[in-house]
Structures are given as C-alpha cells and as structure tokens.
Amino acid sequence: MDDLLAQQIEALEVAVPYCERISNAIGNVMEELNGHRQEDTDEYITSIFNGINWIIEVYNGTRELINKDSVIIDKDSVNASIFKLNAAYNAKNDVMLSDAFGEVKDFVTKFMETARSITDNK
C-alpha cells in the first residue's frame, strides 16, 4: 500500500465515528430549528459547521478513492448543499436552515457509509 493510500484509509477510519457524531448533532439541531430553539442553538450550529468543514476536507482528500470505480458522492451536489446551507444561515431562516441541514446530513451519512465500506474492505 503506498503512502497516499495509507493516509487516505487512515483519514477515512477517523472520519467514520466523527461522521456519526456530526450526523446526530445535525439531527438534534434540526429539531431545535423546528420550533425547539435553545439558548445555545447558534453556538451549536457554529460547532456543527466546524465539523462539516472537517468532513469536507477529508472528503476532498479522499474523493478519488471514494469515487474510484464510479461516482458515489458527486462534488457538485455537495457544493450545492453547502451553498444552500450558507444561504439559509445568512437569511436567518430556521426552516430553510433545517431543510439545508437535512441535505448536508444526507451527504455526511453517505460519506460515512462509503468510508466504512472502504475501511472494512482494505
């Protein structure tokens, strides 16, 4: 196994449990944004944004491995979801933000499942 592949596999191994935590956090914040806002919801959103950014960095560094045989996660779709999330956040619209988080959660889940599959079959 060459160094780049080993680094990609290691990154994916770390990403799997992290994606699980971020996915759960997204689900929680979606509930808060749908009428159950808490005092710290905005701080929670910022923390989740940081986690999503890290996941995107790992995705960008492993995209060739993830999409080795076919396009499993489309970069343009991911970018569109992130753009929608940013627009909803800037609009300060909780309903739009919850919907946008739902799309990003789909990406996080797909990335986690793909990463798990790759690391299980290394």
Language-model segments: which ranges?
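C-terminal-biased regions
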Residues: 1-122
